[in-house]
């Protein structure tokens, strides 16, 4: 099964089991079960279709990890649309390049948890600086709680969801049924070390091959806990957070800032935790300092 089919299956097989948990402004966990998260994703899919998005067209998601990121990405998958992740730290020039080069028609804009209230580091303001140059962008959707751009292309999250009210779920499910293994699932942009970043095309078949390889080495069970903190624009984050999560129907806990990943891990006690070498060096240093302090 491809990832959209996995999401549908999870909603049927584990409707009341926890799917995704995110802390609210009061630091309280808010959890969607698989049935609720499927409905949430379906609403987004319907709105994408109502806005005229056709198979193989692109959307960009410019934000750090949050519920809308997962919903928009999987909604694109369900609609046979291509998702393009944009790092939450990207500058105006960088976001202009990725959105423009990918020919994204819709851009979803969220937050940068490390902006320190500096307007110039906020994704909405960085996109505003270049939106007039992105002629192929039809709509900019502000994620929940994000200030709306001063642009005629910008709409709120509520306005976006309302667009899909007249679209039938059957239209989305027909698109799921029409997905072929060789259809493009997403574009992941390279770091651009030697020039402008290049969009790497990954198909639904690519993801399934990756997931099969992971399962040859590791096996986690439905409902086991996982902490999401690697940026979802990164291939490792997308593999585990968006695809392996759905395949194994794990319970995803979303970190609201990469600065707090260790604190979240202590609280959640995840069965699965992924990271880059630097985070493990930090954990080791903290543990060693604590042990040495007790010696």
Q: Positions of the model-derived regions?
A:
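Structural core segment of the AMP-binding/adenylate-forming
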Residues: 78-162
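ATP-dependent adenylate-forming carboxylate-activation enzymes
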Residues: 63-64, 84-100, 111-121, 250-268, ...
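A short N-terminal helical cap/helix-turn-helix that marks the beginning
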Residues: 1-20
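Conserved AMP-binding A3 loop
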Residues: 31-35, 185-211
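A short helix-loop-beta submotif of the ANL/AMP-binding
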Residues: 57-58, 64-92, 100-106, 224-225, ...
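Conserved AMP-binding/adenylation subdomain of ANL enzymes
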Residues: 208-225, 232-295
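Conserved pre-ATP/AMP-binding loop-to-beta segment of ANL
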Residues: 15-18, 142, 154-155, 165-189, ...
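Conserved AMP-binding/adenylate-forming core of the ANL superfamily
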Residues: 16, 20-66, 70-74, 91-96, ...
């Amino acid at each position: 099964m491809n990832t959209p089919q996995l999401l549908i299956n999870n909603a049927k097989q584990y409707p009341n089991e926890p799917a995704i948990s995110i802390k609210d402004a009061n630091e309280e966990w808010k959890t969607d079960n698989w049935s609720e998260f499927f409905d949430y994703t379906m609403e987004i899919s319907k709105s994408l279709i109502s806005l005229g998005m056709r198979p193989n067209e692109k959307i960009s998601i410019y934000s750090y990890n949050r519920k809308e990121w997962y919903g928009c990405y999987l909604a694109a998958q369900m609609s046979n649309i291509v998702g393009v992740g944009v790092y939450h730290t990207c500058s105006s020039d960088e976001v202009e390049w990725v959105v423009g080069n990918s020919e994204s028609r819709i851009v979803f804009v969220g937050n940068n948890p490390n902006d320190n209230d500096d307007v110039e580091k906020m994704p909405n303001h960085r996109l505003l600086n270049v939106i007039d140059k992105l002629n192929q962008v039809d709509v900019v959707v502000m994620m929940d709680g994000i200030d709306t751009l001063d642009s005629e292309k910008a709409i709120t999250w509520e306005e976006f969801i309302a667009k899909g009210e007249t679209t039938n779920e059957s239209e989305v499910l027909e698109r799921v049924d029409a997905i072929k293994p060789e259809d493009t699932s997403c574009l992941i942009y390279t770091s651009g070390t030697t020039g402008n970043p290049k969009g790497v095309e990954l198909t639904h078949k690519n993801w399934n091959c990756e997931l099969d390889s992971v399962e040859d080495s590791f096996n986690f069970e439905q409902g086991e806990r996982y902490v999401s903190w690697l940026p979802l624009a990164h291939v490792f984050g997308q593999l585990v957070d968006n695809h392996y999560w759905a395949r194994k129907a794990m319970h995803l806990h979303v970190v609201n800032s990469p600065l707090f990943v260790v604190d979240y891990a202590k609280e959640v006690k995840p069965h699965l935790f992924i990271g880059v070498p630097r985070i493990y060096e930090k954990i080791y240093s903290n543990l060693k300092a604590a042990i040495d302090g007790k010696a």
